[in-house]
């Protein structure tokens, strides 16, 4: 069966096909169809059902392209997932909605429905808890929202923090002064800020006290007013640390807590403050809880495959069918 889709502009076809036709090859492979660009039309040939699904995917990609989105492998795979679950109409929800402009002029915006719901919660609620696997953009989008709130003068400070003890290491055994000890743990936060502001602007705001990047222990005893506060890697907080952090909230401030509950480095006898907070605060007004999944992974496709493989392994192990720990 052959189906045809009209292409209004050559640039759209180029964007849809991708570099060396890699996008269209991926569609052909996933749906077992053949796609040809001829006389201003995309001609899709294959089994009737497969051709129909492929056309839906192409239409969704055209919608993204018409709104200025540069189509890449991640877009294609995400659209394929939406089409297969019958949710391709949701793609219209991802057009527009620029959250922030990076230092290099690149628009930062949600790339999946899960990310969009996460950002909606961040903008709406006083406290948002965002959990999900690596690569879902939890921290990066939170930093983008913080930078935009600062640019819009909604807050006077951006405060980024995370537990300083991870992966079995203890700061006292590491060489150097306190700053050199904690810097490696805070590097992902620095990277996100550099991307949004540029190194020079970041340094200027840091010296003025508009930006603070510090270990969680530095939050104790403070009340943080007019600030956008992000707690990253929150799965490694104890219940006491989490309660301490949440009660730092001051007037005119917003808190975003991010973490991955499958990557807890605490001793086995310690309760994760993040997991407990999700249970305790789920129905509290003004607090939003967003759970991202591997469908929201926007890094290299291998990251998504790795996340899925570990999820399958953990499920099998927990049911007594997996290998030894």
Where are each of the predicted segments found?
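Hydrophobic side chains in well-ordered alpha-helices
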Residues: 16, 23, 54-57, 242-245
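Compact, well-ordered interaction domains used in eukaryotic information-processing assemblies
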Residues: 25, 31-34, 38-40
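Short glycine-/aliphatic-rich beta-strand segments at the starts of folded cytosolic domains
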Residues: 1-15
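Short amphipathic alpha-helix segments
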Residues: 12-29
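Conserved helicase motor core of SF1/SF2 NTP-dependent helicases
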Residues: 41, 103-231, 235-325
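Interdomain "pre-motor" coupling segment immediately N-terminal to P-loop NTPase/helicase cores
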Residues: 36-95
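Intrinsically disordered, low-complexity linkers and terminal tails enriched in Pro/Gly
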Residues: 84-98, 315-325
């Amino acid at each position: 069966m052959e189906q045809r889709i009209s292409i209004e502009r050559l640039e759209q076809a180029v964007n849809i096909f991708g570099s060396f036709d890699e996008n269209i090859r991926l569609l052909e492979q996933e749906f077992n169809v053949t796609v040809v660009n001829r006389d201003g039309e995309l001609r899709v040939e294959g089994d009737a059902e497969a051709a129909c699904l492929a056309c839906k995917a192409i239409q969704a990609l055209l919608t993204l392209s018409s709104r200025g989105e540069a189509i890449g492998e991640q877009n294609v795979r995400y659209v394929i997932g939406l089409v297969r679950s019958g949710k391709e109409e949701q793609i219209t929800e991802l057009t527009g909605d620029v959250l922030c402009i990076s230092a290099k002029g690149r628009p930062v915006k949600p790339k999946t429905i899960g990310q969009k719901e996460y950002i909606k919660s961040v903008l709406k609620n006083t406290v948002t808890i965002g959990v999900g696997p690596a690569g879902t953009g939890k921290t990066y989008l939170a930093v983008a929202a913080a930078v935009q709130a600062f640019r819009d003068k909604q807050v006077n400070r951006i405060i980024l923090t995370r537990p300083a003890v991870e992966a079995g290491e203890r700061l006292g055994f590491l060489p150097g002064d306190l700053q050199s000890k904690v810097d490696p743990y805070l590097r992902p936060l620095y990277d996100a800020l550099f991307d949004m502001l540029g190194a020079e602007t970041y340094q200027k705001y840091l010296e003025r006290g508009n930006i603070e990047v510090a270990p969680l222990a530095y939050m104790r005893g403070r009340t943080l007013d007019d600030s956008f506060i992000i707690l990253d890697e929150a799965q490694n907080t104890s219940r006491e640390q989490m309660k301490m952090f949440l009660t730092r909230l001051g007037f005119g401030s917003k808190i975003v807590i991010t973490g991955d509950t499958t990557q807890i480095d605490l001793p086995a006898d310690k309760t994760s403050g993040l997991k407990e907070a999700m249970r305790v605060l789920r129905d509290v007004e003004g607090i939003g809880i967003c759970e991202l999944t591997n469908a929201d992974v926007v890094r290299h496709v291998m990251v998504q495959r790795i996340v899925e493989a570990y999820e399958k392994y953990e499920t099998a192990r927990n049911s007594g069918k997996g290998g030894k720990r």
